[in-house]
């Protein structure tokens, strides 16, 4: 299990958690998956690889992305990831802006365990099964894929990723 400090929120009876993860934890725990293409829809054509400023290793990155008809995400937009890789590097160099200011939204089919602090019922420690792919991205795939690309390139960005986590959410 991985344990992170968390804030438990339960509006309208739907429980979720707010937490922060290291880039390393995100890379270990998140499964990237895009919607599969079946029936009348055609898969997106592969864009011819060209040199770019971000220098993303697309072959390695695309091996990390699964395809499923039950996935939450649309296909990956390469340009967006290239731009985010450059943005993360600029943020690191400038040291003035958070690289990921908005929370990503993550779901899991596995249950989390929340242990509240003695004095606060909504603040505590969240335990998440430590398995590759236990978390799936509902919103924020491009931000996390750009971070993954940098990690694979050997760049330690030292980024903390704010996240909203659901362990019982059916997004459909």
Question: What spans do the regions from the language model cover?
Answer:
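N-terminal extension/subdomain marker
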Residues: 1-100, 106-115, 124
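Basic- and aromatic-enriched surface patches that contact anionic nucleotides/nucleic acids
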Residues: 99-102, 106, 110-172
């Amino acid at each position: 299990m991985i344990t992170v400090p968390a804030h438990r929120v339960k509006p309208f009876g739907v429980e979720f958690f707010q937490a922060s993860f290291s880039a390393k934890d995100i890379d270990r725990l998140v499964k990237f998956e895009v919607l599969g293409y079946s029936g009348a829809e055609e898969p997106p054509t592969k864009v011819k690889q060209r040199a770019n400023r971000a220098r993303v290793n697309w072959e390695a990155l695309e091996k990390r992305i699964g395809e499923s008809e039950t996935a939450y995400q649309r296909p990956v937009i390469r340009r967006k990831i290239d731009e985010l890789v450059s943005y993360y590097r600029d943020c690191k160099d400038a040291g003035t802006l958070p690289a990921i200011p908005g929370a990503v939204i993550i779901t899991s089919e596995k249950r989390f365990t929340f242990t509240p602090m003695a004095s606060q019922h909504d603040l505590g420690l969240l335990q998440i099964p430590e398995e590759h792919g236990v978390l799936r991205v509902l919103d924020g795939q491009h931000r996390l894929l750009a971070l993954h690309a940098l990690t694979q390139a050997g760049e330690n960005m030292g980024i903390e990723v704010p996240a909203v986590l659901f362990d019982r959410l059916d997004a459909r």
